[in-house]
Amino acid sequence: MADNRKALNIGSVIKMSDDINIEIVSEVGRGANCIVYGAVYNDSIGVKHNVRLKECYPAYLLLSRADDNSLSISVGKENEFEDIKEKFIQSYRKNVEIKQTLGLINSTVNPAEIIRKNNTVYILMTLDEGDANVRKMFTAY
């Protein structure tokens, strides 16, 4: 089956609150139920964060994206999409539970927030990526 989902445009902004917006900078990947984006946001004191944003957007439900970035579902599929969104939220809860398990040292993602916007659900995940250059940051002080 061809993947005809329309991703959020680069530069699209999702408003979390009055002072926190998430800006889409890239598409990172796709799964059967989601599209994952690279994104940035500035926290309440202006510090920039690189994050991943996972959008609940199942390929097999033939959703369409409106100009305002909301997802529309065909008549008769609303309940199925609501069930999928609930399972998406349950996976977030499970990931948080795994992340918080004491003694577990192999966590694959760091889920941080659930966002309900655009008639769908997003999972905000922190991005822990770097290289040996981090030593320079600490030795410079």
Predicted features along the sequence, with ranges:
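Juxta-kinase regulatory segment immediately upstream of eukaryotic protein kinase catalytic domains
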Residues: 1-19, 23-26
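Protein kinase glycine-rich loop
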Residues: 25-32, 36
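AlphaC helix of the protein kinase catalytic domain
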Residues: 133-141
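ATP-binding glycine-rich loop module of kinase domains
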Residues: 41-94
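Short beta-strand micro-motifs within the conserved protein kinase catalytic domain, predominantly
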Residues: 102-121
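Conserved alphaC helix of the protein kinase catalytic domain
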Residues: 26, 93-100
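Short hydrophobic-acidic sequence motifs that mark active-site Asp/Glu residues
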Residues: 50-52, 108, 124
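A conserved loop-to-beta-strand element in the N-lobe of protein kinase catalytic cores
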Residues: 117-126, 134-135
